[in-house]
Amino acid sequence: MCIRDSYYRKTYGEIPLWVLANVLTFGNLSKMFRVFPQSLKSKVSKNFEPLNQHQMEQFLSVLTKYRNVCAHGERLFTYRTVDAIADTPLHKKLSLPQSGNQYEKGKQDLFAVVIAFRYLLPGKDFLEFKRKLIKEIDRVNREVEHISEVELLNKMGFPKNWKNITRYHLN
C-alpha cells in the first residue's frame, strides 16, 4: 500500500475511499458507515435499493457479528445476535412465522445473514452463494446422522421454504 499510497496521493491529493475500503476490515467498514453523515449514508444506501440507511446499518452490524463468530471459531449454526435486521419484504413474501408482530426467523439468526446477502450481493453472486450453501447443507445432512435436515434448518433459523428466497423481488 505504501507505493500505491504515494501514487494515490499524487494523483488524487488524498487516498480515495474506494482504495481505503480494500484494506479496511469488515468491522471497520461497518463502524465507518455508522459515523458517516446522514447525507453520505443515504448516498451509499441508494446503491443497494430498496434498502434505506437504517436497514443498511442494521445489516452491516449483524454481518459484522457473524463475521466475528466465524473468525474466532465459534459455533455458527446456532448463533443469535443481540442486534436484529429490520423486517423486509422478503420476510413477508416467504411467510416467515410470527409471534405477535415479530418475525421468529430471519432477524437475528443465520437466515438473517442470508437475507442481508440477498439485498447486498449482486444477483449472480447471491445465486453462487446459495448454490454453495445448498451443497454445504446437503453435505452436513449426509455426514451428521443425529440431526435431521428440518432440525438443522430450524437451528439456523431457516424456514422450510428458504430456497424460494430468489423467487421474489426485493421490494
Per-region residue spans from a language model:
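Long, low-complexity, polar/charged, intrinsically disordered or flexibly structured peripheral segments
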Residues: 14-22
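Polyanionic, low-complexity intrinsically disordered segments
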Residues: 20, 29-65, 72-171
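Conserved small/polar residues in nucleotide/adenosyl-binding loops
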Residues: 1-5
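Active-site acidic/histidine clusters and adjacent loop/turn architecture
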Residues: 9-12
